[in-house]
């Protein structure tokens, strides 16, 4: 359509041939349109970017002639050429010579700012960018119209209409992006389900994310129909078909992370072997694995079948130490008893030298003072000769290698066997009346005998 001056008012329709030709021809004249063309072509978007139109209308005669030539130019190219050449530039630029420069930022209309600020990110992520609208028509960028004479009343109306068109274009593009995201999500879910079908066969493993996995669900009748025959660490709870280890009974609120050995299924079922030898899968024999104590508060009541090697070693060492202690005690007891026997033998050896006057044992009429008698000591007794002779008793002990002395029980005097016999003879009353020898000593005769 033309105004009163005969100029063509081109609204940037993609099907218009005259404006398309002039725009394609004068595209290098606009320095600001080049980075936008490269950006749109790199993103694969067939939409026309919002480039500032500078001095679209020229009032000189030369531009009028040029516009008249454009009116008589051939029709628009066919749709096949338009859609088949995605690399061809469809950027609308202004006609004119190289002397025309872009206007200042005051001339930029509201549609350009809205399109640059509120452009959705989904248009840059998806390669097709939904170049068609919902009704099949091609979306066009808004056009800024400015004149040299400064008449902006008409341009303001155009700017308002273009702003409304840009807003509707943004809404339509968001709806298309939402539809595309739903389609892509469905395709991704289908692709992940296909990956999960071949995941346990060694090709690919499914990725579990979130509370619900996006991969395909396994059938309930056959929970894990696996073909791999290797050891798999299961980070989740094992199904009820898998038997628990025999050393631990089933307890509530206890989900152990166990190692299950998976084998090929038999008769369309799951063949999972987990018995008493399942602990060997960790790389250690069953004897070296520590077990739970039944006496603790958190035990499961079952007696442990596998004993720790450290516990067994400690028990063996303790048994050896106890046996060694018992051996030492028996040896000490045997040594002490043998020492007593040897002392008895030595005393017996010394006694025959003294004759039959000194005999082993204690006299029945001996009176003890202090702590009483000690029958376990090597007691000997003798009876003195003469009118003043009496029976006395004493304790023998080894004084030297071949000498034995006797401590009398009446006075606690250490003497030789000969002196012990004379002490029981006639000189006994004189010693009893003597002040140096008390009749009944209060001291311990056993202690004096050991000293």
From Swiss-Prot:
Family per record: Belongs to the Ninja family.
Subunit structure: Interacts with TIFY10C/JAZ8. Interacts with TIFY11A/JAZ9.
Protein's cellular compartments: Nucleus
Record PANTHER family: AFP HOMOLOG 2 (PTHR31413:SF12)
Gene Ontology terms: cellular component: nucleus
Annotated region described as Disordered, given as residue ranges: 1-223, 321-346, 427-451
Cysteines engaged in disulfide bonds, as pairs: none
Ranges of compositional bias, category Low complexity: 207-216
Acidic residues: bias regions: 154-163
This protein's record includes keyword Nucleus: yes
The keyword Nucleus belongs to this UniProt entry's keyword annotation: yes
Record field: compositional bias (Polar residues): 38-49, 86-103, 143-153
InterPro entries: Ninja_fam, Ninja_motif
Signal peptide positions on this chain: none
Protein name (database record): Protein NINJA homolog 1
Single GO biological process annotation from the record: jasmonic acid mediated signaling pathway
Protein's organism: Oryza sativa subsp. japonica
Keywords from the UniProt entry: Nucleus
Compositional bias annotation for Basic and acidic residues: 23-35
């Amino acid at each position: 359509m033309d105004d009163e001056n005969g100029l063509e008012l081109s609204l940037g329709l993609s099907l218009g041939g005259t404006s398309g030709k002039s725009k394609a021809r004068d595209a290098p004249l606009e320095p600001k349109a080049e980075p936008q063309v490269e950006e749109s072509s790199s993103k694969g978007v067939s939409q026309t970017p919002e480039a500032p139109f500078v001095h679209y209308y020229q009032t000189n005669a030369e531009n009028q002639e040029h516009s008249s030539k454009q009116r008589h130019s051939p029709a628009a190219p066919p749709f096949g050429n338009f859609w088949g050449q995605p690399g061809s530039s469809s950027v609308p630029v202004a006609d004119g010579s190289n002397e025309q420069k872009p206007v200042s930022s005051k001339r930029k209309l509201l549609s350009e700012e809205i399109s640059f600020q509120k452009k959705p990110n989904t248009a840059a992520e998806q390669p097709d960018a939904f170049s068609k609208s919902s009704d099949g028509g091609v979306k066009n960028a808004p056009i800024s119209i400015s004149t040299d004479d400064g008449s902006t009343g008409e341009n303001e109306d155009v700017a308002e209409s273009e702003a409304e068109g840009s807003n509707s274009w943004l809404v339509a593009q968001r709806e298309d992006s939402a539809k595309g995201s739903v389609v892509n999500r469905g395709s991704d879910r289908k692709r992940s389900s296909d990956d999960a079908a071949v995941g346990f066969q060694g090709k690919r493993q499914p990725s579990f994310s979130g509370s619900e996995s996006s991969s395909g669900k396994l059938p309930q009748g056959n929970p894990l129909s696996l073909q791999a025959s290797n050891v798999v660490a299961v980070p989740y709870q094992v199904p009820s078909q898998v038997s628990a280890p025999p050393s631990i009974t089933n307890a509530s609120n206890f989900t152990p992370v166990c190692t299950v050995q998976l084998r090929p299924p038999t008769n369309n079922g799951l063949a999972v072997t987990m018995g008493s030898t399942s602990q060997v899968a960790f790389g250690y024999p069953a004897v070296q694995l520590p077990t739970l104590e039944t006496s603790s508060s958190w035990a499961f009541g079952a007696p442990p079948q596998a004993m720790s090697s450290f516990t067994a070693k400690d028990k063996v060492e303790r048994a050896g130490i106890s046996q060694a202690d018992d051996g030492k005690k028996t040896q000490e007891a045997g040594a002490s008893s043998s020492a007593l026997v040897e002392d008895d033998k030595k005393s017996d050896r010394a006694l025959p030298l003294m004759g039959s006057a000194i005999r082993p044992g204690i006299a029945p009429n001996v009176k003890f003072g202090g702590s009483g008698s000690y029958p376990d000591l090597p007691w000997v007794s003798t009876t003195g000769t003469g009118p003043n002779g009496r029976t006395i008793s004493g304790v023998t002990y080894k004084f030297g290698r071949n000498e034995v002395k006797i401590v009398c029980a009446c006075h606690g005097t250490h003497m030789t066997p000969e002196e012990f016999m004379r002490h029981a003879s006639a000189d006994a009353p004189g010693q009893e009346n003597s002040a140096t020898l008390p009749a009944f000593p209060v001291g311990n005769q056993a202690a004096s005998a050991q000293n």
